[in-house]
Amino acid sequence: CMAVMAMCVLLSCTEKKEEATLSGLMKSNFVSEVQGKPTALYVLKNQNGAEACVTNWGGRLVSVMVPDKDGKMTDVVLGYDNIQQYVDNPNNNYGGLIGRYGNRIANGKFSLDGVEYQLPLNNNGHCLHGGPEGYHTVVWDAKQVNDQSVELTYLSKDGEAGFPGNLNLKVTYTLTNDNAVDIKYEATTDKPTVVNLTNHSYFNLSGVPGSQILDHTLMIAADTYVPVDAT
């Protein structure tokens, strides 16, 4: 009996404790099953020690740990600590992959090749970010390519959320060695459709939870922009 007890003590002492990510996330808190598909947290690390975390639920960027001007590692995007918080708050959009069409489509209607399509209305009579079940609310298939990249794929079927055409999607998140998060979007379709993919991360470069961004200055290097109307 004593030998058995000693073995149990030895096993408990040598049992490896789960390590948190740099941002304090536990990978086990993202292991679940949603919509009949497995979810997980994928951790990307570059040669400088920076880190980005992505979950395949909604293809969401959960955290980005990069050094500030003093070299202190800081999480600069908003995100939840576990998968259940994302599932319970799907339309907060934190870090989500947005599609089939980012932003609003007025009155949820558009015409293509002489056919008018009606989309679900989820924002004051308009269709926002592909509707209430956009790509930020689905489980993507995921494959970690290497330490710095994860590849997400999803088939958006013809008629999903009212959009025409089967759309095969591949999105690759890469944490580069200059501490940038590179997001590459690829999509192919079998019939004319509309596509406008983006990411919906909320940035706070101060890294202080609960702080505002009113002292941030933003500059966008763009040659053109699309003006908006009252809708």
PLM regions: where:
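Sec-dependent signal peptide recognition
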Residues: 1-4
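C-terminal motif of bacterial Sec signal peptides marking the signal peptidase cleavage site
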Residues: 9-12
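An exposed, glycine/acidic-rich loop-and-rim segment of catalytic or binding clefts
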Residues: 14-50, 56-231
